[in-house]
Amino acid sequence: MQKASTSAGAKTAGNRKMQKSPNNGAAKAQKSAKTVDTVTDSELLYNPPAFLTAAEKERRKYLQARVRAEGESASTSSKSNATRPTDRKRHLQAEDPLPADANNNDTNKGGKVAQESASTQAAGTTKRKQPRSQGLEQTSPIMVNGEALACPLVRKSLPAAEAAKSCPLPSKKDSVTKSPMTVHEAPKVDSATSNSNEKQLATMPVDIHKTDSIEEGRRVLEWLINPVAVNQFFADFWENNACVVQRKNPNYYSKLMSFKMIDDILMRNRVEFGTNLDVTIYRNGKRETLNPEGRAFPSVVWDFYAEGCSIRILNPSTYLLGLRQVCSIMQEFFHCLVGANVYLTPPNSQGFAPHYDDIEAFVIQVEGRKRWRLYEPPEKADQLSRTSSGNYDQKQLGEPIIDEVLEAGDLLYFPRGTVHQAITEKGHFSLHITLSVYQQQAYANLLETLMPIVLKKAVKKSVALRRGLPLHTFHVLGEVQRTNRCESRDQLVENVQKLVSKYLMPSTQDIDEAVDQLAKKFQHEALPPIILPEEKVRTVFGSRSISDQEGNSVCDYEFDTDTSVRLLRANILRLVNEDDGSVKIYHHVNNALEYCKYEPNFLEILQEEAIAVEVLISAYPYYITVDQLPLKTVARKVEVATALWEHGLLMTEKPFK
């Protein structure tokens, strides 16, 4: 196996330490001296004092043991007693206040999941049905001992969101007339239940280099859809029903994006119209795209915005580290590319015509507010559609199944094939992010890859499939001949059906091969991993060569049989046996931030070396020593481990220096 040179240009993300909030600091200043001197659990974990009492040392050991525990789920202990809903009219709200999150939100200033009171509902509309309690299980943000440690992302990566002076943040939500819909509420949680549930909540990992990337992706999804439990989300909503989460917590997603960040992106980067940014408007019942040619300078973009046009950034994760981290971590959980678009809409405007998409959509309202209306797919064949639709006219749409206003901190999920449109209200702009998941991930995509494989193998094995068609085939089969009922036609149809049933049943090996091809496609599409500081010192991304007195290059690493290694991520590579007999490792370590900008990255290895990669895949997330690689010689074991590490695919348990 040939060694690779050290990868250049690898960027690192911030660490996972807590940031101190000005709000939290002010709150602490108002406490008594006794309260100030008390060391919190968060401080014990991440910023312990120089001198600890015996009790504090024991408490710190206990907390460290808790956060290291693997397999801890974020679900609550109580089960939902409600039956599974069958309609698509979903609206999740919770009543109890949640602790402050990573965005430094004060619990006394809107750190709650929003719930409309009965009086507000009555004032909004008399048509709306009274809510029915569904008995949803409630989860909380990432916590330790009741303190929310935050959005599970790298801190210090982005500044706090700021609203543009011309577009102040909207006031509190006022009454909005809505279509009648069933509201499913989260039940109140008493203090006893809340305390018991805290033991099961996911916590901020301490040993970053030992975490499971799939579980990290699940943890980010949990934060995204909180207070809906992940298991409940997949049981009740995923690919079936829309879900609305309202929080009255405008800062919940503020670390990801802001109005000001858009201006910074335009100023600091060469953003191209049509490639990176679209200017759209919906007027007279039609959507118009108004992209000029060339670079999207800030002054030009804001002129369009001032005229009522919507701004869509097509690849925001290229420019925003925090958003990129959300996408790159979630793609580990979903095993597919997680894309993102940013939409900025001026007041009293609509940028897009009603349509449906071919993705599972998570709409994250970051700033402002926007009214969303969702409709059933026009045709049954449009449900879970594999392609996006054209634009619909308002006359083609029926009554909306959901008509809701999203405010900053709210979230809306809806399945692919759901017709939707959104409009801002007078006096209120909107900034939201749409995360797109599960595009072209259906069984149909697997079968499209699988059946050619099956047919190719069957043709080689079966003479019957290679025999020529009868001479009269064109005269008895075809669209024109469909009303022609004759014995020869029926016999030909029966022959084709028998050939399919006899020779085209896929084997397990065929299915494995097809799935490998889909996974290879994911490696080409995926975002590159963000390497954290704890990972950088254990990977090639932190390696630096030096020169000795004679000018020779000296590496700062050296593998031996006792070196412990593991894969960088659970899905960082795919081992594929190609048709020509070669064995290749496809990976996304060096992928571009732009979609499929480069050709797929791969390493070609020897057939006898594949078993070593298989062992590494099976061992993840645990470390194994180089000596445990099932290769014949020690030299080959060290060579293979070194080569994989030099390509950025492996991480050592301990830094070399």
Curated annotation (Swiss-Prot):
Phosphothreonine PTM positions: 139
Modified residues annotated as Phosphoserine in this record: 133, 140
EC number(s) on file: 1.14.11.-, 1.14.11.27
Disulfide bonds: none
Domain JmjC intervals: 315-454
UniProt region (Disordered), positions on chain: 1-141, 165-198
Keywords in alphabetical order: Chromatin regulator, Dioxygenase, Iron, Metal-binding, Nucleus, Oxidoreductase, Phosphoprotein, Repressor, Transcription, Transcription regulation
GO biological process: behavioral response to ethanol; circadian behavior; negative regulation of DNA-templated transcription
Gene Ontology, cellular component aspect: nucleolus; nucleus
Subcellular location as annotated: Nucleus
Gene3D superfamilies linked to this entry: 3.90.930.40, Cupin, JmjC domain-containing ribosomal oxygenase (ROX), dimer domain
Cofactor binding comment, as recorded: Binds 1 Fe(2+) ion per subunit.
Feature: compositional bias, Polar residues: 32-41, 73-84, 132-141
Recorded superkingdom: Eukaryota
Basic and acidic residues bias locations: 55-71
InterPro entries in the cross-refs: JmjC_dom, NO66-like, RIOX1/NO66-like_C_WH
Annotated binding of Fe cation, by residue: 355, 357, 420
GO molecular function, one term: histone H3K4me/H3K4me2/H3K4me3 demethylase activity
Cofactors that this protein relies on: Fe(2+)
Coiled coil: none
Catalytic activity: N(6),N(6)-dimethyl-L-lysyl(36)-[histone H3] + 2 2-oxoglutarate + 2 O2 = L-lysyl(36)-[histone H3] + 2 formaldehyde + 2 succinate + 2 CO2
PANTHER family named among the record's database cross-references: MINA53 MYC INDUCED NUCLEAR ANTIGEN (PTHR13096), RIBOSOMAL OXYGENASE 1 (PTHR13096:SF8)
Function of the protein: Oxygenase that can act as both a histone lysine demethylase and a ribosomal histidine hydroxylase. Specifically demethylates 'Lys-4' (H3K4me) and 'Lys-36' (H3K36me) of histone H3, thereby playing a central role in histone code.
Family: Belongs to the ROX family. NO66 subfamily.
Protein name, UniProt field: Bifunctional lysine-specific demethylase and histidyl-hydroxylase NO66
Organism: Drosophila erecta
Taxonomic placement: Eukaryota, Metazoa, Ecdysozoa, Arthropoda, Hexapoda
